[in-house]
C-alpha cells in the first residue's frame, strides 16, 4: 500500500550500490511492483500519444519487461522467489478503488492483478524460477521469508516490506547491465 513520505524519512539509510551487490543472494521479489509500474507506464504513454500507440504493441509489455529483469537477476547469480499478492485487506479497499479510478471496490480479490499474474507465472515457470502466492500482502510474505532465513533480502519499491520486518530492501532494479540499485538496510 505504501506509506506517505516513507522514502524521505528513511533516506539516510539508503545507499546506491551496483546491481552486482545482489550476486549470490536469495531474494524475495514483490511481483506486483513490476506489473503495476509497467501498466501505469503504458497508460501514460498511450495518454500522451493520444492513443496512437496500439494496444497490440503494449498488451504484454509487462511480460517482456519481466523476462529481461528475470534474465538479469539470473545473470547476476541471484536466486529470486517471486511473491504474488493475495486478497487485499479491507483497510486497503478504498486505496485500491482510488487507484483504479472507481467509486468503490467490493472485495479484495485483486482481479486486475490476478489477470496479469497468470502469464507472469507461466513465464517464471518456463524460466525455472520459483513463485508463491501470499494469502494477503506480498510485502508481508517477503519480509517473513527473510525473517525465517529463506531469503537474504527483498526486492520491492514498497516500504511496507520494512514495516513488516524486512531488514534488507533493494529497489530501483533495472535489467540494464551497468545500473545501480538502491539498498536500504535497517535493523529494527
PLM regions and their residue ranges:
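Extended two-metal-dependent nuclease catalytic cores across DNA- and RNA-processing enzymes
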Residues: 89, 93-188
Amino acid at each position: 500500500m505504501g506509506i506517505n513520505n516513507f522514502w524521505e524519512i528513511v533516506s539516510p539509510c539508503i545507499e546506491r550500490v551496483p546491481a552486482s551487490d545482489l550476486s549470490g543472494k536469495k531474494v524475495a521479489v514483490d511481483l506486483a511492483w513490476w506489473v503495476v509500474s509497467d501498466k501505469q507506464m503504458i497508460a501514460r504513454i498511450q495518454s500522451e500519444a493520444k492513443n496512437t500507440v496500439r494496444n497490440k504493441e503494449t498488451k504484454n509489455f509487462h511480460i517482456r519487461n519481466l523476462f529481461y529483469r528475470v534474465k538479469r537477476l539470473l545473470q547476476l547469480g541471484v536466486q529470486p522467489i517471486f511473491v504474488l499478492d493475495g486478497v487485499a485487506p479491507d483497510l486497503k479497499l478504498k486505496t485500491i478503488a482510488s487507484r483504479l479510478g472507481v467509486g468503490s471496490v467490493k472485495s479484495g480479490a485483486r482481479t486486475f492483478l490476478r489477470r496479469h499474474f497468470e502469464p507472469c507465472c507461466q513465464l517464471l515457470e518456463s524460466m525455472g524460477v520459483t513463485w508463491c502466492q501470499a494469502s494477503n500482502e506480498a510485502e508481508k510474505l517477503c519480509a517473513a521469508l527473510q525473517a525465517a532465513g529463506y531469503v537474504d533480502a527483498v526486492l520491492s519499491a514498497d516500504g511496507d516490506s520494512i514495516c513488516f520486518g524486512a531488514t534488507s530492501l533493494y529497489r530501483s532494479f533495472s535489467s540494464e547491465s551497468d545500473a545501480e540499485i538502491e539498498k536500504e538496510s535497517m535493523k529494527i
